[in-house]
Amino acid sequence: MLDGSLGFCIVAIVEERDGLPVCVAEDHLYDRPLLQRITNLIPSPVERTMLTEVVVGTGPGSYSGVRIAASAAVGIAAGLALPLRESASDQALWQAAQRSFSIPLGTRESLEVLESGALVVPRETASLHLSQEESRGVAACALARAAGPAVAHITLRYPAPARGSEGQ
């Protein structure tokens, strides 16, 4: 499970037990490089063969974070010949948090995540961000639970058109 929408990357191993996703391992070393964090969770070739799929959060959220996590997920899925599933980050994370929260989208804006959906707001009016501590254990399971069927290509979700593209 990989998701970079929050501005820090969630890296976790999730198993299904009695029909429910359970986070069995999660790397909380957010200041470490992403590939190092991934290999910390699955260090040996034997452990890698126990993986059955790769799930990635597709945003909306941190522009760079979503793209980095998606790139890593595609590489892992291709390298290990595993199915790739995508999960709408805002919807899954709202289910995990059970409250409104915001995701920083640079220095001026945030993505306000509400039960009814997500919208871009000025950063100064945004609600509290979902913290790293709040996300532990629950975010990965929520993303896994909300994942769709296997896909050949990831479709990243953006909250608004890119700046300057309005007239095109």
Where are these predicted regions, by residue range?
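DPxDG-like acidic metal-binding loop motif
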Residues: 53-58, 63-83
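Phosphate/pyrophosphate-binding loops at sites that engage ATP/ADP/AMP, CoA/4′-phosphopantetheine
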Residues: 38-53
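Generic alpha-helical scaffold signal
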Residues: 28, 32-35, 48, 66-70
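Buried hydrophobic packing segments
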Residues: 38, 72-77, 142-144
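Short, low-complexity, polar/charged sequence segments that are solvent-exposed and flexible
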Residues: 18-21, 42-44, 73-76, 120-121
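Long, contiguous secondary-structure blocks with strong helical propensity
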Residues: 2-8, 15-16, 52-55, 72-77
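Oxyanion-binding and handling regions
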Residues: 1-36, 85-168
